[in-house]
Amino acid sequence: MDFITKKILILVKTYPSLSKKYTELVCTAGMDEDGNWYRLYPIPFRKLSDEKQYGKYRWIEVKMFKNPEDPRIESYKIVYEDMKLLNKIPSNDWGAKSNIVLKKEVHTDLSKLIELSKSTNISLAVFKPTKIKNFIWKEVEREYPKERIENIEAERKQLNLFSNADENINDFKIVNKLPYKFSFVFEDINGKEATLMIEDWEVGAAFWNWTKHYKSEDIALQKIKEKFFDDYAQKKDLHFFLGTTRQFHNMGKNPFIIIGVFPLPKVVQNSLF
């Protein structure tokens, strides 16, 4: 097992998903200073102590090794107990963000990207849609399967006996299941239309925060569309961070989902070129 230590800029945090071993996990991905992608796991984010919880555009230093069980070339296991939080890029410093995010290839042809994922096992990419047509959602099951929750709770009780000091397990509650799936409808450079689900934590957090604030799911849904479509898609030079799931990487016709967004202000984009 060959460990390496890397400085990574966090770009992606997905909405938490259930895990039998870790209760729940957050898909976390970012780039090093040369613009190379890394997928970091396992990270039981909400169980980490406060001083180890990171936000987007935070540099972190991690000790990691390539997971031999995962064919996706960017996937690394980390020693999250040794993770160090470094400086954060200011929220309005889009030049500094772009210097990392746009350093390497920005994909515009979805079919070619899918072919590339099959031939080289790449599974993370920056993608620039040519036209964003809509932001949609559909209602799904509101609760996790009861049996799955029971299995996770039983496993957690055992694991808590050997919990790590860096994990904040007191009064930990499993994350609420999102009752909607959100997707962007867009065209690539060839005019090919696609509908891809977005699993960015920001979407889920916005749904719960606005539902609580307005006491209405319908208003919350419209507010989310205003942010991600009316603002990001219509007024910004929006890029997607695409990623594949391990389950469908080699199986799905299109294994990619949207795991994050990069809403670059157009004035910054113009100044870069």
Where do the language-model regions lie?
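Sequence-level detector for tyrosine residue identity
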Residues: 15, 22, 38-41, 54-57, ...
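N-terminal ordered "arm"
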Residues: 2-68
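OB-fold single-stranded nucleic acid-binding module
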Residues: 64-79, 246-250
